[in-house]
Amino acid sequence: MSMSDPIADMLTRIRNAQGVQKASVVMPSSKLKAAIAKVLKDEGYVEDFSVQEEGGKAQLTIGLKYYAGRPVIERIERVSKPGLRVYKGRSDIPHVMNGLGVAIISTPQGLMTDRKARATGVGGEVLCYVA
């Protein structure tokens, strides 16, 4: 069975794993998922991530991060969906929780946070919000 929205599946796996205090979560890998994991690591929301080949299929492993027994990621939600894409110009890029969270944006220069997109002066597809 094909997956209609692999990014939503990734975010749901992270949300569910943190809900039961898992140390890490494993999922099928893709270039886009690895790029999202890199942004999450750079922003300090996850410990680390790695991509391994298992039986001809690439698997993405994300090490989850906790502080005082609570997940560092309080909220992670998909914004642009396959049925309703959400694009924002450089002047319309949203602030997540007044700057306390980040929006991950797919731009012509690659994936980046809302802050970096504003600084670079580019817009793009708003993939998800993380807080």
From Swiss-Prot:
Keywords: Ribonucleoprotein, Ribosomal protein, RNA-binding, rRNA-binding. Part of the 30S ribosomal subunit. Contacts proteins S5 and S12. This is Small ribosomal subunit protein uS8. Pfam families: Ribosomal_S8. It comes from Cupriavidus metallidurans (strain ATCC 43123 / DSM 2839 / NBRC 102507 / CH34). GO terms for molecular function: rRNA binding; structural constituent of ribosome. The gene is rpsH. GO terms for biological process: translation. Belongs to the universal ribosomal protein uS8 family. InterPro entries: Ribosomal_uS8, Ribosomal_uS8_CS, Ribosomal_uS8_sf.
